[in-house]
């Protein structure tokens, strides 16, 4: 079976622009939570916003100011550009592809169009909402980087980026491509904020994944991309190997997590097996850990079923960056690769009391200099779409 290597990383989130800024914030325990400033809203809940405005993002990308870009596309362009530059590849080759994901697409641009149209129907221009479709941001990234190979968009809610990474790996393993830029992007918008509020799972305080008092999630925005390559196409030393992956569709509920953790159990156990490992080989778990009562309970039960009493160190970065929906595993895959690269375990912020049922206690302090060989990273979406990835050191 062909090995899949990670050779490029790119990320933007509420804790930084670029890989180095994100890593510095994780090391310092610096979260990105604050009040909503991107748009007016009656909701008083913390979110993790990317600090740059749309115009600032356009300038960073040297884009024309007169053209309409959704914020989702701008965030994706910046992270994808960083990953592409890091990999040092010619992305115009037909053997290089792009698999990008998003949950809400260009909804933020559509909301701006709707507001101006309601104010004066002569102001609304239909060409301003061409970025509404989920595939629009992917097409913009492909055009910006000159990608001529396979270009595909995935949207499976919060597991989107994990599934994009898996599809990219499969295309390489089957010999269809030599390299693929994979990941996801999502921006904050009213649709997302009001939608999660209607589900009554937004915490009015900073989220507390796996804590007994957890009361919901905090939303965030950002983008994360990786470049995956086959061994024969390598031109630089890779960061690590994408050694395993799996997706399990339990279809328990449209928005809720299965109480017995069947979906997470299947995706985690199958990803570990796909990597040719046993549960005892996992050194760190980047859990999905949104901070909602049902998600953390479900994921906790699955972890107990797989690892029993030998639970490896685990943590959630959602209290740093919020839940970035379709971008979450793109961003967190970058963090997982950095964990292996530098021997790091990130803290779960705001954790104080262990859950009475699971008894699980995540890592609460930043740890470095550790022999991290295998990282399991989880990403679970609405509709029971559960995905897990395993990243491994080069000499395993």
Regions found by a protein language model. Give the residues of each.
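ACP-dependent fatty acid/polyketide chain-elongation machinery
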Residues: 1-63, 232-241, 334-349, 392-396
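Condensing-enzyme catalytic core mediating Claisen C-C bond formation in acyl metabolism
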Residues: 3-7, 27-36, 202, 206-275, ...
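Conserved small-residue
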Residues: 8, 26, 80, 98, ...
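Active-site pocket-shaping loop/turn-to-helix segments
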Residues: 14, 61-81, 125-133, 151-163, ...
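Conserved active-site "lid/cap" helical segment
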Residues: 15, 20-21, 25-100, 106-107, ...
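Active-site-proximal alpha-helical scaffold in enzymes
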Residues: 76-88, 134, 142-145, 151-183, ...
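Active-site-proximal gating segment of KS-fold condensing enzymes and close homologs
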Residues: 102-152, 295-309
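Acyl-CoA/ACP chain-elongation machinery
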Residues: 176-198, 203-214, 245-259, 287-296, ...
């Amino acid at each position: 079976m062909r090995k899949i290597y990670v050779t490029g990383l790119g990320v933007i989130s509420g804790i930084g622009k670029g890989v180095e800024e994100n890593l510095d914030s994780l090391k310092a325990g610096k979260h990105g939570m604050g009040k909503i400033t991107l748009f007016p809203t009656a909701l008083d809940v913390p979110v993790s916003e990317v600090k740059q405005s749309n115009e600032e993002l356009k300038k960073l990308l040297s884009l024309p100011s007169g053209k309409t870009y959704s914020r989702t596309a701008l965030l994706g362009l910046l992270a994808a550009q960083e990953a592409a530059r890091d990999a040092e590849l010619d992305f115009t080759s037909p053997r290089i592809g792009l698999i990008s994901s998003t949950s809400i697409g260009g909804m933020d641009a559509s909301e701006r169009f709707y507001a101006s149209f309601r104010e004066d129907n002569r102001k609304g221009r239909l060409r301003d909402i061409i970025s509404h479709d989920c595939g629009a941001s992917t097409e913009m990234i492909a055009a910006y980087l000159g990608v001529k190979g396979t270009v595909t968009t995935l949207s499976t809610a919060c597991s989107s980026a994990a599934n994009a990474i898996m599809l990219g790996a499969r295309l390489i393993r089957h010999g269809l491509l030599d390299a693929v830029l994979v990941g996801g992007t999502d921006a904050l918008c009213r649709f997302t904020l009001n939608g999660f509020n209607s589900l009554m799972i937004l915490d009015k305080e900073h989220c507390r994944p796996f804590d007994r008092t957890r009361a919901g999630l905090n939303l965030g925005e950002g983008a994360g991309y990786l470049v995956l390559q086959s061994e024969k196409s390598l031109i630089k030393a890779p960061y690590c190997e994408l050694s395993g992956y799996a997706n399990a569709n339990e279809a328990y509920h449209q928005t809720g997590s299965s109480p017995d953790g069947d979906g997470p159990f299947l995706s985690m156990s199958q990803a570990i097996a796909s990597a040719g490992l046993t549960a005892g080989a996992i050194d760190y778990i980047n859990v999905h850990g949104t901070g909602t009562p049902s998600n953390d309970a479900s994921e906790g039960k699955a972890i107990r079923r797989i690892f029993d009493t030998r639970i490896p160190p685990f943590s959630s970065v959602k209290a740093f960056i919020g839940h970035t929906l379709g971008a979450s595993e793109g961003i967190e895959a970058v963090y997982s690769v950095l964990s292996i690269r530098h021997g790091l375990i990130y803290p779960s912020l705001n954790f104080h009391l262990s859950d009475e049922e699971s008894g699980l206690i995540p890592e609460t302090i930043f740890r470095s200099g550790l022999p991290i060989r295998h990282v399991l990273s989880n990403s679970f979406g609405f509709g029971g779409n559960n995905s897990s990835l395993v990243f491994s050191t080069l000499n395993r």
